Amino acid sequence: MVDTMNARNTQFTKAFHALKQNAGSHSPSMEDLKKMFPTLEIKIDACYLSNPYASELVLDYIDRELIQTNAYKKVLTHYPSQQRSLQKVMAESLHVKPENIFIGNGATEIIQMLLQQEEVQKVALMIPTFSSYYEFVGKGCEVVYFPLNERDDYSFDADKYCQFIENEQPDTVVLINPNNPNGAYLSLEKMHILLKRLAFVPRIIIDESFIHFAYEDEALTCLSSTVLFDMYPNVIIVKSLSKDFGIAGVRLGYALMDSRKIDALLEHGFLWNINGIGEYCLRLFVREDFLKRYEEARKQYIKEMCRFKEALLGIENVYVYPSMANFVMLKLPSRIKASFVISALLVEYGIYVRTMADKIGVEGECIRIAGRTREENNCIVMALKSILKDSK
């Protein structure tokens, strides 16, 4: 039985590896997987990072307000609002000036746009990190890496990082908080200390794509770095609403930055870079009725993530890296290949997780698992225990 499973998984692993190479440093989409493996039934998507409870909330609004009323026809056939109009919509909720808001087709579009500006000539990054930050830099741009230590759980030493920046003198510094792929978090207090020391850096990009899943008190208060943008003129904040709302397919994000940078961008495009469905979801962000329910979904998800992480800690011989995001990075026993576990999860259980094999700076056999609903998380834990037990 085990030998049959191993043979089937080995064959699948080779085919999946080829598909992964075509996808670059990102995971193959669900559609690409279904196309290559027609008989594969993916039951749980624990690869892509979004809040499943928020997904259901947004779908409920879309169903009631767009589908049942036939309003979706206007959303699909009419031009969406332009960037300047949507800036004013977001300003109501963020309490910042409209001219300081840039709305993007997902956070990735914003990252690419920021890193390909002519003035960006030297970028400082921590590794491991989100691959787009070193893939999207402009031609001729130098990238310097600050390696996070595996022995310290890839946590962030602000003092050492400041020394590194002072020595390297980059014009652009990137901070992902919580970090991807390990979920390490830097508190708001420590962030203030860091930014004061790095006041000499022309621009600091703070990517908060996962900040809604972090917390600093028992009330799980929603964290915001808008105050950082107000206090430090060199700071640019990047946010992903796709992850917050659980709507990765819509592609929606925004950034807070100097109005002059936004004016320069809008001179060369980005007039209608958000589609009609994206605009509808964006307008939910400023509605009190939606935000009240979203806050309930956000806290429900955080509580489930805490329970899920505790359950993962109970798996024998697996190391669980501390995380304040909606995902967890696991280090497998050295005798077990991550590729085998990923294939076994997909083939035998229909669970899709992320390999860390292509992540610069990650040591050992590691996988990343996104948190899902309680029922789905229970299935993930059960499947992992079974696979690792059979692999002894």
UniProtKB/Swiss-Prot annotation:
Effect ascribed to mutating S242T: Increased enzyme activity with of L-threonine phosphate and a decreased activity with L-serine phosphate. Exhibits similar activity rates with both substrates
- Give the reactions, separated by semicolons, that this protein catalyses: O-phospho-L-serine + H(+) = phosphoethanolamine + CO2
Q: What's one GO MF term for it?
A: carboxy-lyase activity
What top-level branch of life does the organism fall under? Bacteria
Q: How does it assemble?
A: Homodimer.
Quote the function comment for this protein. Pyridoxal phosphate (PLP)-dependent decarboxylase involved in the biosynthesis of norcobamides, cofactors in the tetrachloroethene reductive dehalogenase PceA of S.multivorans. Catalyzes the decarboxylation of L-serine O-phosphate to ethanolamine O-phosphate, the precursor for the linkage between the nucleotide loop and the corrin ring in norcobamide. Less active with L-threonine phosphate. No activity with L-serine or L-threonine. Has no aminotransferase activity as no production of L-glutamate with L-histidinol phosphate and 2-oxoglutarate as substrates.
Instruction: Report the protein name in the record.
Output: L-serine phosphate decarboxylase
